[in-house]
From Swiss-Prot:
Domain spans labelled Carrier: 2-77
GO terms under biological process: lipid A biosynthetic process
UniProt-recorded name of the protein: Acyl carrier protein
Lineage: Bacteria, Pseudomonadati, Pseudomonadota, Betaproteobacteria, Neisseriales
Pfam families in the record: PP-binding
Length: 79
């Protein structure tokens, strides 16, 4: 079973059409990986589906890097 970090990075790579090797923890979805606002919405939806959790819009707006996505999922997965 892949850990949360690997799963998040895989989803980011798939959603943004980038090589998984380019997806670093500190990568910004917009600045480093070329995401636009629609990409980020789709990314949040993919994370919600993968981890069976709901990410409210106000929280989703704060998730701008790969590490923030990993941290959010990790913090909310057990709830």
């Amino acid at each position: 079973m892949e850990n949360i970090e690997q799963r998040v990075k895989k989803i980011v790579a798939e959603q943004l059409g980038v090589n998984e090797a380019e997806v670093k923890n500190e990568s910004s979805f917009v600045d480093d990986l070329g995401a636009d606002s629609l990409d980020t919405v789709e990314l949040v939806m993919a994370l919600e589906e993968e981890f069976e959790c709901e990410i409210p819009d106000e929280e989703a707006e704060k998730i701008t890097t790969v590490q923030q996505a990993i941290d959010y999922v990790t913090a909310h997965l057990d709830k």
